[in-house]
Amino acid sequence: MAKQKQQYVTIKGTKDGLTLHLDDRCSYDDLLKEIEERLVKQAGVAPDSPLVSVHLKIGNRYLTPAQEEEVRALIRRSKNLVVDSIESNVMSKAEAIEWMRKTEIVPVSRIVRSGQVLHVEGDLLLIGDVNPGGTVIAGGNIFILGALRGIAHAGYAGNKQAIIVASVMKPMQLRIGDIMSRAPDSKTDEGNEMECAYIDEHNQIVVDRLQLLMHLRPNLTRLERRM
């Protein structure tokens, strides 16, 4: 009995088109050969057939931009197939550096004075105060071990899950994502409890006790893991 040839391409039909699971252990050349045999040479479709979206799942294989373009062009030769997305479990070094830059916690020890702006891409851990007229901006969360009396903008790129935490919460203005709020005029006592600001289910910024944060954002554990 002839040995059955191992398949490197698994094709599954979905309501959105086709999903191709590509083997991530075979050689790149073998993968191209099988794609050509199964999708291009066997393609018998009418010239006016509608386009079908193809989603590629390549597992733990990394394709360079040139290889991605080669695979897209090869599949496009089947007349009615077009690659809509390529999903991989790995990322390039540049992508990894960019991801770390946007998700890392940046510790800063200083006082942000009036007219000064402190800007970070990831989460900000500020050990110090933000004076009136000072501004802190972060792509992620903002943690202030000190007094916030100026302006704080968390999740500046649109992350509405971001939060702002301060030992003393007396801000001139709070912003999370594209939502803005000013501190209530009636708040005069500073108290001894740290407070947090977040966007609630009504799409409004709410300031409350820090102890509620574990219930509001149960997945917020990166700060604890990295300190």
UniProtKB/Swiss-Prot annotation:
Q: Does the keyword Amino-acid biosynthesis apply?
A: no
Highest rank taxon of the organism: Bacteria
Recite the UniProt keywords alphabetically.
Cell cycle, Cell division, Septation
Annotated InterPro entries: CAP/MinC_C (IPR016098), MinC (IPR013033), MinC_C_sf (IPR036145), MinC_N_1 (IPR055219), Septum_form_inhib_MinC_C (IPR005526)
Q: Which family does it belong to?
A: Belongs to the MinC family.
Which NCBIfam families does the entry mention? minC (TIGR01222)
What HAMAP family does its record include?
MinC
Q: What is the protein name stated in its UniProt record?
A: Probable septum site-determining protein MinC
| Organism, scientific name | Geobacillus kaustophilus (strain HTA426)
Top-down, what is the taxonomic lineage of the species of origin? Answer: Bacteria, Bacillati, Bacillota, Bacilli, Bacillales
Q: Which gene encodes it?
A: minC
